[in-house]
Amino acid sequence: MKRNFILVLFAAVAMVKPLAERPNFILCMADDQGWGDTGYNGHPILKTPVMDEMARSGLRFDRFYSAAAVCSPTRGSVMTGRNPNRFGCFAWGYTLRPQEITIAEALKKAGYTTGHFGKWHIGSMRADGAASPGNSGFDDWFSSPNFYENSPLFSHNGQVIETDGESSHVTTALALDWIANAAKRDQPFLAVIWFGNPHSPHVAVDKYKKMYADQPDGAAHFYGEITAMDAALGELRKGIRKLGVADNTVLWYCSDNGAIPRGSTGGLRARKGSLYEGGIRVPAIIEWPARIKSNRITNMNGNTSDIYPTLLELAGAPLPKNQPVLDGTSLVPVLNGKAMRREKPMGFWTYQAKGHGRKSRAMLEELRQEQLAGNQKPAEPEGQIDRQYPTDTLPGHTTWIDGDYKLHRLPVKKNKGEFAYELYHLGNDPGEQQNLLGNNEKLAKRVARMKTGLAAWQKSVVKSLNGDDYR
């Protein structure tokens, strides 16, 4: 029933638009930039003039969330429109499943050309990898298996290449060259640009580090990386204007999770790795001159799983016939200025799993040596369903956001299998300091409804995790 409902929901926008009328899409994502790590959100030191300008001219989301509290799962949510636990992407270093349908695959069927640039972190850099960018719908890719630093190695469609320069600028230059070729063909495009900044280790080039000469060395490098990324965003915006495609290009910027210890949460509770606001609320801005004529700020809830259905609706493309259950919802009404409240609650779930470390340069250097020797190894299997998960035990920290209210379900450390609950009103208490649960009878019905909704959603996620969506 849920899948049929989704298909009916999109039927009204499924009429395919002529190619010339379809917007282009650029999805930019920072790596570990917290909610408070921008000038426009009040950082007292950090210089982000381009992001500040975007926040003044575009649509600024003040309640936008990463679908997970760490990187790989969030990236998987962007690609699929689904909570990452549905396809077993529990933590950093986990991959997509080959059965998933990505936004690149869906837009390719609608006539788009697709490119990925920068951090991938949800699959192999080998061309034959089941979850490589190429086997996830991208026509062209200059990608890194994880975070990357200056003068990075990239995998270009599976072949290792060298680059020279500040990491964000190198990534942007590659993307602009590719966009220029798409513009010459007059073909709508999807460019996914996932920066390596400001993930540690922090090594800013002198030009940007010098801007923070009065700060401790570590902070100067951290701030310098963000300002360098900001400047690269500026080059991207200038570049698409010069190419004449800016007016009908949707440029969507956000981060993959909340702040790291050196970063700023802007006063929100906790940091990267936590489902409290400081771990998942992230900066987010959309620019689209053809549609967003003046600055708007929205407090409507949104998250990275919404990107997939939003782009498909904007492209006038139907959902694939075999589309698995979506967690995201289209934010087109927000772009059109016609929505103030999100009707669909948002679920978040940190499933208890250890991450898998990936050292980008070492992995790509190993691949390069294999290629130079003419003895490239086959990619390892990725995204396999290796077990069945029970639906009666739902471990880990989960949250359920419905309007202004956020319910936490937290495992009790001393008593395995038991959970404690907390409730916060994000409009009045964004820092999540005042737990509203107790003897408040006025909230009893709401809490019961939220608990029921969260439990049903978790069971749905486990069914997806066990492969039900692919049968």
Question: What is each PLM-predicted segment?
Answer:
Residues K2-F5, M15-E422, P430-R471:
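Formylglycine-dependent sulfatase
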Residues L7-F10:
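Sec-dependent N-terminal signal peptides
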